């Protein structure tokens, strides 16, 4: 019986094993979930545009602001400066006036530099040119207008290639009217010739001479237009005696505070314009001590050697130095410390004087610089101790 039960049990086990494969359960891995990610965009930095300042253009002779670069030619006009030839006509409209000995030991003349001669109706009185003017013409690339000259002076100008002409010569007058005579002020014949600015420029143009030129004229101007040297000595009156051997000639510059300019005084009187009555006054005054010689007739200057001198503006004066690189370069001016001289916006008088010429000046601080600090009218100054005592005082007592 036990054997039957055992067989039955074995049989049952075999039958259960043949009933099919047991199910295998696969645990499916969950599908990967892709989370969409936003693309990271680096913030775009816009380039910072720094506004560029518009360029500022200046007149190279007077520092005035222009709308465009100055590319014109400068004109130099020869003007008499002897006592019998006063008063001048429109000399003060020149951007730069240079005074110097020119010949025969004691003859002084001026070379007036104009950046816009066309706008000047009359200029004079006009005298003949001299070799020393040829030097300056070469330094500044000038077109020179004059009343003729000696064979020496004219031949020298021609040999250097200087563009120049006699405003009264017939061949010039046939092209355009460049001059007129005026004896109204009892002038002698040689002192009655005057140039016409528009005619002078028109004649220069008719000759095919270059009327545009970009170059350095040596002058530097303060950005704010104020060229007063803060450290300068007070100089209400500046006196220069041009001196060469026995020859003497006095020039005085007197500061006019209302005008803010130096008024030219010579021959014992204040210089005024014949037509307008305007004072001949200058914003800047430069005194150039120069090595000058005389060959028996004409004066000559060694400009390339440079030198020392003085600069005045706004009632103050300082010592300066000046240089000139070569025969074709303009004069350049520096302070004693070697910094470029920054001039005031306006016209300039330049004296080119021999080394033995004395220069003096006198002046004092203007009234507004000597007054004490202003106080409120009618109020006395109160000390800190008095103020503290007043604060502690009972209202009845205070008031």
Question: Which role does the model predict for each range below?
Answer:
Residues 27, 32-52, 375:
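Extracellular mucin-like PTS domains
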Residues 10-11, 387:
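Short, linear, compositionally biased motifs with a strong N-terminal bias
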Residues 380-399:
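Long, low-complexity, intrinsically disordered segments
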Residues 19-22:
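Bacterial signal peptide processing site
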Residues 14-17:
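C-terminal motif of bacterial Sec signal peptides marking the signal peptidase cleavage site
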Residues 1-9:
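Positively charged n-region of N-terminal signal peptides that target proteins for export
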Residues 50-98, 104-380, 398:
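A surface/extracellular/periplasmic glyco- and lipid-processing/surface-interacting theme
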């Amino acid at each position: 019986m036990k054997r039957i039960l055992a067989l039955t049990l074995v049989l049952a086990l075999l039958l259960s094993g043949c009933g099919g494969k047991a199910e295998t359960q696969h645990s499916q891995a969950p599908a990967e979930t892709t989370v969409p990610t936003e693309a990271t965009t680096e913030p775009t930095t816009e380039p910072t545009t720094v506004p560029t300042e518009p360029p500022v253009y200046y007149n190279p002779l007077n520092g005035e602001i222009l709308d465009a670069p100055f590319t014109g030619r400068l004109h130099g006009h020869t003007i008499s400066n002897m006592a019998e030839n006063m008063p001048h006509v429109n000399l003060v409209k020149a951007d730069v006036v240079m005074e110097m000995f020119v010949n025969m030991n004691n003859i002084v003349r001026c070379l007036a530099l104009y950046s816009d001669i066309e706008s000047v109706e009359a200029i004079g009185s006009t005298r003949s040119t001299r070799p020393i003017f040829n030097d300056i013409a070469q330094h500044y690339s000038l077109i020179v207008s004059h009343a003729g000259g000696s064979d020496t002076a004219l031949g020298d100008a021609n040999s250097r290639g200087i563009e120049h002409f006699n405003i009264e010569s017939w061949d010039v007058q046939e092209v355009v009217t460049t001059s007129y005579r005026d004896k109204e002020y009892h002038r002698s014949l040689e002192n009655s010739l005057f140039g016409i600015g528009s005619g002078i420029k028109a004649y220069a143009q008719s000759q095919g001479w270059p009327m545009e030129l970009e170059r350095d004229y040596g002058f530097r101007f303060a950005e704010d237009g104020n060229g007063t040297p803060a450290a300068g000595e007070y100089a209400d009156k500046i006196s220069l005696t041009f001196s060469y051997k026995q020859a003497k000639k006095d020039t005085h510059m007197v500061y006019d505070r209302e005008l803010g300019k130096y008024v030219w005084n010579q021959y014992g009187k204040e210089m005024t314009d014949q037509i307008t009555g305007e004072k001949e006054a200058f914003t800047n005054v430069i005194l150039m001590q120069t090595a000058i010689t005389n060959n028996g007739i004409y004066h000559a200057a060694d400009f390339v050697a440079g030198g020392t001198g003085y600069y005045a503006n706004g009632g103050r004066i300082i010592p300066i130095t000046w240089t000139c690189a070569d025969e074709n370069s303009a004069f350049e001016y520096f302070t004693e410390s070697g910094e470029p001289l920054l001039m005031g916006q306006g016209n300039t008088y330049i004296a080119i004087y021999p080394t033995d010429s004395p220069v003096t000046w006198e002046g004092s601080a203007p009234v507004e610089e000597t007054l004490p600090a202003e106080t409120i009218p009618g109020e006395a100054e109160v000390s800190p101790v008095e103020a503290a005592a007043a604060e502690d005082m009972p209202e009845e007592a205070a008031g």
